[in-house]
Swiss-Prot record:
Domain of life (superkingdom): Eukaryota
Cysteines paired by S-S bonds: none
Protein name: F-box protein PP2-B15
Any one Gene Ontology molecular-function term assigned to this protein's record: carbohydrate binding
Gene: PP2B15
Domain F-box as annotated: residue spans: 1-43
InterPro entries: F-box-like_dom_sf, PP2-like
Pfam families per the UniProt record, alphabetical: PP2
PANTHER family in the record: F-BOX DOMAIN-CONTAINING PROTEIN (PTHR32278), F-BOX PROTEIN PP2-B15 (PTHR32278:SF122)
């Protein structure tokens, strides 16, 4: 005996988007129930109406909640095109990308240090490229209340190294994450991948500075470097953090940063697209299948 469609819809609303999508193969009742607005509204962020109102096309009409869900999976521009909002297809977890204009970048308003211009490879209307500086400081902020509750998040600086880059692989930068009044978590990373030939040339010019920074020497096997993304950009993990239950006064400010201010090392030739904050994959415990 088949359950009524309304009962099936109620059951599906307590599962996940992935379960609902796969259940469509069970029967026509599951397929119809799984397409209902009742089910998909449960999977949408609780503040989805507010998110849509902040989009660059706030008056767009969606034929169903499932269509809206799919749209958010593809991502939308919000806050005058300065942020990207997205949800994961199988889990409904929230992600954000803060554009370079939404970040605090020291001296980014000085044209002899940084250059702002439209980029065909950017998600946003413009990006910024470092011309030259010895004081690199990039800071982004987001509230935990804007993210999915009880979720482990990672923050990633989206960047590219240009063909004329210099001074990026001699002195490590610091990455950090700080949530509310909690302890700041600091790690070190290089801004470009190791290039032995280029390093030998730069040592001629920056040898003394390199000696002053000898205490920051990183064993090659443990050297953190940018990693290639599927979209052609590269990313540096700034750190990770957990969101709380989202109830009461659980909303906290997350400060994410990348800095290189200790080596007085001239550097240039990196393009910044923004900082992505996205859920990290669940870790599989040793010994589990």
């Amino acid at each position: 005996m088949m359950l009524p469609e309304a009962c099936v819809a109620t059951i599906l609303s307590f599962t996940t988007p992935a379960d609902t999508i796969s259940s469509a193969a069970v029967s026509s009742v599951f397929r119809v129930a799984g397409d209902s607005d009742f089910v998909w509204e449960k999977f949408l962020p609780t503040d989805y109406c507010h998110v849509i109102s902040r989009s660059t096309d706030p008056h767009r009409i969606f034929s169903s909640k499932k269509e809206l869900y799919r749209c958010l999976c593809e991502s939308i521009l919000i806050d005058n095109g300065r942020k990207i909002f997205k949800i994961e297809k199988l889990s409904g977890k929230i992600s954000y990308i803060l554009s370079s204009r939404d970040l605090s970048i020291t001296w980014s308003d000085q044209r002899h240090y940084w250059s702002w211009s439209p980029r065909s490879d950017s998600r946003f209307s413009e990006g910024v490229q470092l011309i030259m500086t010895d004081w690199l400081e990039i800071i982004g902020k987001i509230q935990t209340g804007a993210l999915s509750p009880n979720t482990n998040y990672g923050a990633y600086l989206i960047m590219k190294v240009t063909s004329r880059a210099y001074g990026l692989d001699l002195v490590p930068a610091e990455t950090s994450i700080k949530v509310g009044n909690g302890e700041k978590k600091i790690k070190s990373t290089y801004l470009s991948c190791l290039d032995n030939k280029k390093q030998q040339m730069e040592r001629v010019f920056y040898g003394q500075r390199e000696q002053r920074m000898a205490t920051h020497e990183v064993v090659r096997s443990h050297r953190r470097e940018p990693e290639v993304r599927d979209d052609g950009w590269m990313e540096i993990e700034l750190g990770e953090f957990e969101t709380g239950s989202g109830e009461g006064d659980d909303d906290k400010e997350v400060v994410m940063s990348l800095t290189e201010v200790k080596g007085y090392q001239l550097k240039g030739g990196i393009a910044i697209d923004g900082i992505e904050v996205r859920p990290k994959p669940l870790k599989v415990r040793a010994g589990t299948n």
